[in-house]
Amino acid sequence: MNIPFLKKNGIKEFKLKQIKSDASFRKYFRIYTKNKSINLLLVRSPKKKENNLGYIKTANILEEMNLSVPKIIDYDNKKNLFLIEDFGSQTFKNSLKNGVDEYKLYNLAVETLIYIYKWKINLKKKLPLYSEKKLINEALLFLEWYWPFIYKKKPSQKTIDEFIKIWKFLLKKNLKSKKILVHRDFHIDNLFFLKNRVKLRSCGLIDFQDAV
């Protein structure tokens, strides 16, 4: 399976084991040679469904910040394949189950967010702007999902218009605030506890392709 792509990266005799993936069209395969993992993942990520270029751009920015993201070994745009570093299975969620101190993990996550907020980097030409339109579209998910659940019907156009008007008012100050990188999917399944790394680098970040 996909032998040429792996062979050109020096991986000849191998076995692939598909691992549980997130809610996306990506598929992840752990690579084994001689029954041992080599800490690399083969990722099939269809560019028509996934933001592959956004992933690469954001990975480069986070690396520039000296944060831990899976190192991209190779990318084949035509075949929609990535070869990336394997962070293993110790997500924050699994780490909590395995007895890692809860305060330690949550403090690490918060300190990582603070560090990103303070980082001085010009993102205007690198990532999409978290615009009013994008923010309102995300707020509208409330009406799309929660409103019908409570009221057993879809919201009227009048309700939608009033909802948008309220959010436009609330977002005025927000849109004038400092422009920073926003991960947009920062939660315990997308954070890894890398115990062999120090300080903020012990927080591994994934699933950041839609960052703004």
Q: What does each model-found stretch correspond to?
A:
Residues 29-137, 175-176:
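ATP-binding pocket architecture of kinase catalytic cores
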Residues 91, 96, 151, 190-195:
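Activation segment
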Residues 11-32:
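ATP-binding glycine-rich phosphate-binding loop
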Residues 2, 121-128, 133-134, 138-182, ...:
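An alpha-helical support segment within catalytic cores of ATP-dependent transferases
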